[in-house]
Amino acid sequence: MKEGIHPNYREVLFHDVSNDFKFVTRSTIQTKDTIEHEGKTYPLAKIEVSSESHPFYTGTQKIMDTAGRVEKFRQKFGSKLGAAKK
C-alpha cells in the first residue's frame, strides 16, 4: 500500500441533533469539532437524522423538513400540479 493516500479511519462520535442521541463508530469523515464522551475525546460529526430519530425505525410520523424544502417545492410547482390533475 502507498503511504499517505488513504483516509484516516478512526472512531468518531455522531450526534443526532434532533433528539440529542450520540453514538461512536468508526469513520473517515473529516471534522473540526471535538467532544469528550465517557472520558475520551472524539471528533464530532453533527447529523440531523439517525436510526433513533428516523420515522422508519421509530414507527412515528414526524415532519423532518428543517430546510423548508417542502414549502419551496410547493411555491415552485404548486400551481402546475393542481392544473395537471384536472
Swiss-Prot record:
One of the GO BP terms on file: translation
HAMAP family: Ribosomal_bL31_2
Name of protein: Large ribosomal subunit protein bL31B
Any GO CC annotation of this UniProt entry: ribonucleoprotein complex
UniProt-listed InterPro entries: Ribosomal_bL28/bL31-like_sf, Ribosomal_bL31, Ribosomal_bL31_B, Ribosomal_bL31_sf
UniProt similarity note: Belongs to the bacterial ribosomal protein bL31 family. Type B subfamily.
Keyword Ribosomal protein in record: yes
Oligomeric and partner information: Part of the 50S ribosomal subunit.
Coiled-coil region list: none
Gene Ontology terms, MF aspect: structural constituent of ribosome
Record keywords, A-Z: Ribonucleoprotein, Ribosomal protein
Listed SUPFAM superfamilies: L28p-like
Ribonucleoprotein listed as a keyword: yes
Signal peptide: none
A Pfam family assignment: Ribosomal_L31
